[in-house]
């Protein structure tokens, strides 16, 4: 696995978060130009990695956080105009080399999933089911035939603050729901936070090893 193909995030790192969000509305020409330049860099960088890998890189990790706890960070229309086309171009290059695209975006993103799929992702990563509207059963039923899922075990509640039994229950639910007929990689809903009980982390993996979807 290689890469971190962010486009939206790389752009706002350069301009500042609030400033770039304002650019999208007040100075769209500049925003488009910055995103285009970032994409050109990411495509060339990714191409060099894949060429150096000589067919041995199975997976490229990309991502742009577009979700918050309550909904999308930017409107879906803004995402479609400014962000999606650039990831389509990047993902096309990744697929040309026979690699798979795993795409990270956490938060409440249900309404964006069809467009994430349309831009060429293969694996949707993070799966923050603590966020509004995120539903494992609906994701699997609606998109599970063509999209793989990774993550889901809560780093906001279950892993840091739950009991071992809570972790076992949640892990079992996710494996049986998202893992039915394959297409699920168990993992936390984001980075495991400092102070998370080690026994809870172990319970997540031990439970998964004992289960069949």
Task: Give names to the regions the model predicted.
Residues 1-213:
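Active-site loop segments of alpha/beta catalytic cores
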């Amino acid at each position: 696995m290689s890469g971190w193909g962010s486009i939206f995030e790389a752009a706002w790192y350069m301009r500042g978060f609030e400033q770039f969000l304002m650019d999208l509305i007040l100075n769209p020409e500049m925003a488009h130009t910055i995103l285009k330049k970032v994409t050109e860099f990411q495509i060339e960088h990714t191409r060099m990695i894949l060429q150096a890998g000589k067919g041995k890189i199975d997976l490229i990790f990309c991502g742009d956080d577009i979700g918050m706890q309550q909904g999308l960070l930017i409107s879906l229309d803004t995402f479609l105009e400014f962000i999606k086309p650039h990831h389509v171009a990047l993902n096309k290059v990744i697929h040309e080399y026979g690699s798979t695209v795993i795409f990270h975006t956490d938060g409440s993103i249900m309404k964006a999933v069809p467009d994430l799929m349309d831009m060429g992702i293969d694996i949707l990563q993070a799966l923050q089911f603590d966020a509004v509207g995120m539903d494992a059963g609906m994701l699997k039923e609606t998109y599970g035939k063509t999209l793989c899922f990774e993550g889901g075990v809560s780093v906001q509640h279950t892993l840091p603050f739950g009991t071992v039994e809570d972790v076992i229950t949640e892990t079992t639910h996710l494996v049986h729901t998202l893992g039915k007929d394959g297409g699920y990689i168990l993992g936390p809903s984001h980075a495991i936070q400092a102070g998370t009980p080690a026994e809870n982390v172990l319970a997540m993996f031990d439970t998964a090893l004992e289960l069949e979807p």
